[in-house]
Structures are given as C-alpha cells and as structure tokens.
Amino acid sequence: MRAKIPSEEVAVKLNEWYKLIRAFEADQAEALKQEIEYDLEDMEENQDLLLYFSLMEFRHRIMLDKLMPVKDSDTKPPFSDMLNEIESNQQKLTGLLEYYFYYFRGMYEFKQKNFILAIDHYKHAEEKLEYVEDEIEKAEFLFKVAEVYYHIKQTYFSMNYASQALDIYTKYELYGRRRVQCEFIIAGNLTDVYHHEKALTHLCSALEHARQLEEAYMIAAAYYNVGHCKYSLGDYKEAEGYFKTAAAIFEEHNFQQAVQAVFSLTHIYCKEGKYDKAVEAYDRGIKSAAEWEDDMYLTKFRLIHELYLGSGDLNVLTECFDLLESRQLLADAEDLLHDTAERFNQLEHYESAAFFYRRLMNIKKKLAEQRFQ
C-alpha cells in the first residue's frame, strides 16, 4: 500500500499541468494528467484540490478540442457530462476556483459560438480577477475577452483587451503564438473600422512570426486573415490566393477551420463570377461542414448558394438569416445581408434589395445596442 501523498505535492503538479495546457503542449499535458490521476488515488483528502482537478480536466479538454477538434459524441466523457459534474459543486467554489469556473465556462460557450453567454461568464470571472497573481494568466484572460468582443464587433472593447494582453505577452519570449493571435484580433478590429492598411501591417507581421513558429495552424490562420483583409480592400484576386493556401493547410492537417476557409473561398468565387469554381468549392465546403456538424456554416453555405447559384428565393434567404440571428450571430448576418442587398440591387430587383437593406439597418442597430450593454 502506497503512503498518502501530501495534497501540496499534487497541487504543484496541477499548476504545472495548467501551464502546459496554456502553452498548448498537448503531449506533455496528457502525460502529466495521467500522473496526477494516479496520485489522486492515494492523495490525502482535499476537496478543493479535487475541484481544481475537475476544472483543469475541463480546460484540458477545451485545449485538446482546439488543437484536434472531434465531435462531442466521440469524446469520453462528453463536455455536457463534465459541465454537469462541475456545476453540481459550484456552490463550493470560492476565490480562485470560482474565477476558473466562470473563465472556463466562458471559453466553452465561446467554442459553442454562444458569444453573449460567453461574455456574461467572462464578466463574472473578471470580478474575481483579483485572485489571479500570475501575469500570464491575466494575459490569457484578457486575450479571451478580446476574442469574444471581436466576434460581436464591439471593436473598442476588443482592441483595449487585446492591447493589454499583447503588452504582457511581449515580455515573455515563449508566448509567440499568443502574440500572433493578439495581432490577428487587433488587425480584425482595425478592418472592422475600415483601417485596412493598418490592419495589413499587423497581419503581415503576424504571418512572418507564424512562419517562424513553424506551426501549421498559425500559418494557415495568418494566410486566412491576410486574405480576409485583402477581401475587405476589394482585392479579390489576391484574397483568393490567400484563402486557397489557408484552406489547403487547414485541410491537410484536418483542422475544423478548413470549413471557414472554404466558405470564404466559395464566397469570393461567387463575387468574382467564377461560378464553376464556386460550385466545386461549395460541394467541398458543405461536405466538410456536415462532417463537423457545424450548423452555422451549413446555414451560411446554404445562404450563399441560394443567393449566387440558386434562384434567390426570398423565403430561403430569410430563413437562413433568421437562423443566424437566433444564434446571436449578428456580425455574420450583417456582412451577408450587405452582400445580399447589393446582389439584388445589381440584378435590378430593387424591392428585394430594399427589403434586405432594411433588415441590414435593423442588425446594425442591434449591434450598436450591444456596444452599450
């Protein structure tokens, strides 16, 4: 029989495990997790530490899903079961553990594209940020908040949080990946307020740094973001090249982000009038979105297919926009409503164009209201 292991020793390992998770060191994190699970069998009783382990296990799963996404039904245990177990002990969480609960729950809701819910949890976590002493941990939180605000176009909130995070990451050489991701967010926000050239400067820097990291995911993401900026500048030919490169890398490594890249490629082919290529990309993208069970992109693919490759049925388009709005994906709806209205205007279907312009104004109003919540 093994001697009881002091909980302090296990706590040290839990902290090391979390550092590996934050750094996306999946293999090392998995090995240490197994070691900790073995230690827990003979650890002296400490309920707080067991709760800490449950929270870190949940965060570990989020990390793995980011690096190697799999369908939730294929995982053991499912996210929902892990959440239920943690929430059943929520009343026991105080201080730092309560911070982790809200922070990780926010990350989960962000993963599910429930952006408003994610922000709500992050706000609760921010109230507990005083319990966080580690500077990198604060930077991680700031980065995550910047990320979700970017997705709902709360530009200045996002820029503020991203800049604070970047200031911290710049002090630490090991956090090159996060520096690149902060550059992505800052550039995306600059694009949203039409400072495209400034955004491109950040993105070219991010692409160079991503190549130095030699990480396929980051390189593909950098190509995608440069493509998005070129698209915003109206340089469709160059954007097409960047999207093709991003899609190829994402697909080669079986990253879920391939769905997004192929959607952007399909969209740009449609706008360029390259309909044969658009059909090929659409078939590729809709298959990928179905395999990943990505309802948002299934809806977006259906929408642009109907708009550019189908008959432009108003009922189908309206149903697609209703679905996007019901998921609070207002920024996505805004961009596609603009294209839909412009498309009908070009086709001289002025009544339909006016209908979608009015809906676009409605979405802009909702986004503006969110900025003051």
UniProtKB/Swiss-Prot annotation:
It is an enzyme of class 3 (hydrolase). The keyword Protease does not apply. L-glutamyl-L-arginyl-glycyl-L-methionyl-L-threonine binds at residues 147, 150, 181, 192, 217, 225, 228, 260, 297, 300, 335. GO terms for cellular component: cytoplasm. Pfam families: RapH_N. TPR repeats lie at residues 99-135, 146-179, 220-253, 259-292, 334-367. GO terms for biological process: sporulation resulting in formation of a cellular spore. One of its GO terms (molecular function) is phosphoprotein phosphatase activity. Keywords: Allosteric enzyme, Cytoplasm, Hydrolase, Protein phosphatase, Repeat, Sporulation, TPR repeat. Inhibited in vitro by the competence and sporulation stimulating factor (CSF), encoded by phrC. However, CSF has at least three targets (RapB, RapC, and RapJ) and the physiological importance of RapJ inhibition by CSF is unknown. Interaction with CSF induces a conformational change in RapJ. Belongs to the Rap family. Involved in the regulation of sporulation. Acts as a phosphatase that specifically dephosphorylates the sporulation initiation phosphotransferase Spo0F and inhibits its activity. This is Response regulator aspartate phosphatase J.
